[in-house]
Regions:
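Carbohydrate transferase catalytic cores enriched for Leloir-type hexosyltransferases
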Residues: 1-378
Length: 378
């Protein structure tokens, strides 16, 4: 007997909002993994997107590209007005599919609640990536929608996917009335490209920091810790990959610490990121909180030793392959960093541990785990 095909509708919300980012990466990988799976029909009404992850995926190179070749090829010509118009078209197409009710399960990609008015009695599975807005409200004063919208969706969802045990614990700590039985943990993975032969203008010896540097990422704290280490090692640099140019606060502190000549900010392509990791003495991730922490996996997959806080989801991701410091303890971080920089054998040990740990995570596992939860929700 043939198994009944499961029809899953994914909303285009995150692909409209993000040009790149962890959430759109997650849904691109899930969508791509399930798209050609037997017994599964996945639909995401995405008539147009500027999302880089989607454009680099097999989804873009097949039906998406063929159906929208004109828009893709000529969007630069119409750049001033076309994206907004096409995103509205995405929304209209999405609403029409919701109203048609020809699906078994709905998967929202973020926390907009508008779909609820059209959903009827159809089940939906919500992924919760973190509880940053709830735990650090001082950093999101202008965002008045995310917290109440997320709460509403968590209460109404058939199932909730949390991307770490840490995130699940945070959900239940903040909202103890939510049924713990409907929350299941599914780990993410990484999509790091293999290091290429591209020649990058990077120093011979450097510590690596990757991504956003604001607020709970603890970059200012890290700058103060790394400053004396840089001064004691004139041939050592700090490379900040991504995150845009240093802001006024960062630049002022760099000037005051007198370490301008040993700090570089570099923007990168996805195809270059592995080179940054592989060339580094170590990767430092001083963040106070992450729902998961994909950069930790990326670094380990590239054989780059990782120093990170013993907090949040990090022990779940790095396991015994991480070198942990006590959160916000400057002396502890400084000691761990010096130990690693001064000991080649220790770096080699954690390089190998990291490769083994990173190999435990892949998007196929993530997609299969999500699909099992989707099936249980119908």
């Amino acid at each position: 007997m043939n198994q009944k095909t499961i029809n899953i509708l994914i909303d285009p919300q995150i692909f409209n909002e993000q040009k790149f980012g962890g959430i759109s990466r997650y849904y691109t990988e899930i969508y791509a993994a399930l798209k050609n799976k037997e017994g599964v029909e996945v639909n995401c009404p995405l008539l147009y997107t500027e999302n880089i992850h989607f454009k680099e995926s097999p989804l873009f190179n097949t039906s998406f590209q063929k159906k929208n070749a004109f828009l893709i090829n000529y969007s630069k010509v119409f750049r001033p007005f076309l994206p907004r118009k096409l995103k509205k078209k995405n929304a209209r197409e999405f609403i029409s599919l919701l109203k048609a009710q020809e699906f078994d399960l709905f998967v929202p990609t973020y926390y907009n609640t508008d779909f609820l008015r059209y959903l009827g009695n159809k089940p939906f599975v919500l992924t919760v990536y973190d509880m940053i807005h709830e735990l650090f409200p001082q950093y999101f004063l202008e965002d008045r929608d995310t917290v109440p919208n997320k709460k509403t969706l968590m209460e109404k969802a058939t199932k909730i996917i949390a991307i770490s045990e840490s995130t699940k614990t945070d959900i239940l700590s903040i909202y103890p009335h939510i049924d713990a039985r409907k929350i299941e943990v599914v780990y993410l993975a990484h999509s790091i490209k293999t290091a290429s032969n591209i020649k990058l203008d990077l120093p011979k010896k450097y510590i690596l920091f990757v991504g956003n540097r604001l607020f709970y990422k603890n970059f200012i704290f890290f700058l103060r810790v790394v400053s004396p280490i840089l001064k004691a090692n004139p041939d050592l640099y700090l490379v900040c990959a991504g995150g845009n140019a240093f802001n006024d606060e960062e630049q002022e502190l760099i000037n005051n610490l007198n370490i301008n000549s040993q700090i570089l900010q570099k923007n990168f392509l996805d195809t270059e990121l592995a080179n940054y990791y592989q060339g580094a003495q170590c990767f430092v991730f001083p963040s106070a909180y992450e729902g998961f922490g994909i950069p930790v996996l990326e670094a380990m997959a590239c054989g780059c030793p990782v120093i990170l806080a013993d907090h949040s989801s990090f022990p779940e991701v790095a396991g015994n392959a991480g070198i942990y410091f006590e959160l916000n303890n400057a002396e502890d971080l400084s000691n761990k960093l010096n130990q690693l920089l001064e000991n080649n054998n220790l770096r080699t040990e954690y390089k190998h541990k990291g490769l083994i740990q990173a190999d435990k995570f892949n998007w196929q596992k993530t997609a299969e785990a999500c699909l099992n939860i989707y099936k249980k929700s119908i």
